Amino acid sequence: MTQLTQEAKVVTTPQAVFIGEDTSNFLRAEHAEAGTSRAYEEHARQRRRATPFGASEQNWRRRDKFFEYLRTCAIDSTRARCMTEVFQATEGQPQAIRIARGVARTLAEIPVFIDDDDLFAGNVTGRPMASHIYPELMPDYYTSEAVDWDAVRTQPSPVIITPEDLALLTSIAPYWRGKTIGDRWNELRRADDEALNRHCLYFSYNMLAGIGHVIANIPLVLQRGLAGLREEATRARKKEATARKPDPDRLAFYDSVIISLDGVVRYAQRHAEECGRLAASAGDPTRRLQLERMAEACRRVPEHPPCDTFEALQSALFVLYGLAAESSQISICPGRVDQWLAPFVEHDLATGTPPEAIIELLEAVICKLAHWWTFTGREAAIIDTGNNLCTFTIGGSHADGSDATTVVTEMVLRAYNHMRMAHPPLALRVHKGTPDHVWEAAVRCISNGCGMPSFMNDEVMVSALQDLGFSAEDAHNYADVGCVEMGSTGTSLGPVSIGFINLAKCLELALNDGRCALSKDQLGPRTGRLAEHESFESVRRAYERQLAFAVENFNHSVSALEQAHAELRPVPLLSALTDNAIREGRDLIRGSSKYRYAGIEGIGFAEVADSLTAIKHLVFDEQAVTAEELYDQIQADFPDERLRQRLINRAPKYGNDEDTADAMAAWVCERFVQEVKSHRDYWNSEYSAGAWSIALAMTLGFGVGALPNGRRASQTLTEGIRPASGCDRNGPTSCLKSVARIDHRLFQNGSIFNMTFTPEMLDGDANRRKFSQLLRTFFVMGGFQLQFNVVDAAVLREAKAHPERHRGLIVRVAGYCAYFVNETSHVQDQIIERTCNRAWTGTY
């Protein structure tokens, strides 16, 4: 078979290529011979008849096993042991080489796990669903002193650790003390940084989890293979070694790249051997053929360029698993899947492969990556639940503005619709030229309760990235690298999720002379109590001072953490998969990426906007309540319920197409971005601002006292830029108009807008057309992102009471989806309380 490279032409899919909703009729007429097609259609109908949503029976069996594995997520200490032994044996050697040897040894010793229903080889660890441990970051995070393992075993998403694994982690912890990222950070950061984190003014711990929120440069691997990259690194090393004054750091970098690439190749070869062994003993002829195909692919990729769709996907999986062994951070993403996969799919379709066979492979990849789970310590259940956020991006436009839809775009949507899994996330880029059939397929997927895709507006994000310094070509090549933050394949390294600022806490300090309302500790500058301000502008100035205090201290904290990474934690494998690193002889963490910027996210936009509006409207404009009275009420967490209801119901609220409240929300966003942009990080890189929160809107909300919008102390904050729950009362159109008043181009790191509709609202073609038009109108008005829950609150309450009946119920938590029954009770309640749209217009 002719070998394909990324120079192959990506054929744009014409409209109405796909015939009917039944995926057995998913045919590309110009590629299919009539007799073969009819035979395959009958075969597809037979093997899909027993599955609820159209997935192949084999993939559906694998999905069923996933839910069993989900109850036994485990800790795998293999990597921790390998990394420790390598570091102990290589004292004094360059850090990059030590990291590379540790990763290579891990990939050489992880047990090979292949499920009986797997169509692809590879896994993050040697167990069905388990997490690596990364002692070089913060080893005590995993010991009995730091984690109540008995509690973790009984949480909604239980985590299992064997006595042997726990004993090993405990035994290696002393070696790492004083040598880790966490230790170095503690030496560099300010004395009060821990207190400001603990009081929920900000959350600056993200990079303790390693380097992530990046795009694995799959197109580069498919074009050249790891052997091609190794050859380039070898040539560069030889050139450096023969220079008049060889640079030892560059030589060490090249050595670390070669070691890392060889480690991934050996990892694939081990799977080829195991697949061959299993094939030889397989009793079922069909399974034997599958295993032989897997073995053949593992012998070729990712060392060499793939020959077909199957090998391209297998190569991508091995690269992702290799990167998981190098760095623990979530959101190592495959980028624009429909772009890099299209040449292989087009080739296979042209040579007689039925479209259903391609969709079956995509289903299998979705299921494989759903097993990528990362233990993030004690807070996992309330911060991110271990979701790895290996986001797929599809759709979008080219640099010339033309549509980038390929034959793969709708195939991916249909595969997600078939599998109905919460992970991996799926983002659809849309623009003015997005074909109707793509909109229709995406809306149908949403209407079925998948929670995916999320929708992202090219016109806004391309402009925002160009403002950040991206070329037009690179900006048009953006992809989601997690919840909603953006990167460009092979050219950018964030860290785009460096941490979070709690805007609601800033307001609390502004109203309380810089003191925490809960602990009474003095945290921020003294800006006076609410009753001491004689004008609304004085209140706003106090808020601005507290915001500036928070961002300045946060900047120092995360810059110290960046410095710790630069000194101790190179990423040679990830560096090898970029455009510049091998050419420059410099690791990504040392600044070799074409674009480098750090993302700071704000949390609590709606609470701050509505609280400031309430103060202005009820205290200073109408004088319906005195500043002293309001101050006393929020300090005491609203003993007067009647006053709290006045604040909730009489003051204008963001989300209702009301000028005063919406203008305040726009100001809160603009002021946050201005403050973020006034700082630079350790690398003197520009910050980009975002409005999203993973699940930290709940976590950071615990540390915020009562607010003037009527929110009680320690309640959750609102994620992203959506209006506060229950405050958008005039229907979805008014809500969308309010959100569109914000200048979304300011959020170069993305913003999240969650909406909830009942299933009846999207039932039938007419309602789905209304829904699609609503989305398009929002994007024409300048909105950036939309994502949806399509579920009734009554169903959620039933699922909370009887989780055993609803194991597959998917909900949007923040920028990611999750299985509702696996979330904590607090998260479940927050989702239930969100505004649910039951009508297209009017109060409800």
Spans of model-derived segments:
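Core nucleic-acid recognition elements
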Residues: M1
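Extended, non-transmembrane alpha-helical coiled-coils
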Residues: R266, R270-E273, R277, R293-E296
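A conserved hydrophobic secondary-structure block that centers on an alpha-helix together
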Residues: L278-T286
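Extended non-globular scaffold/tether segments
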Residues: D255-R266, H271
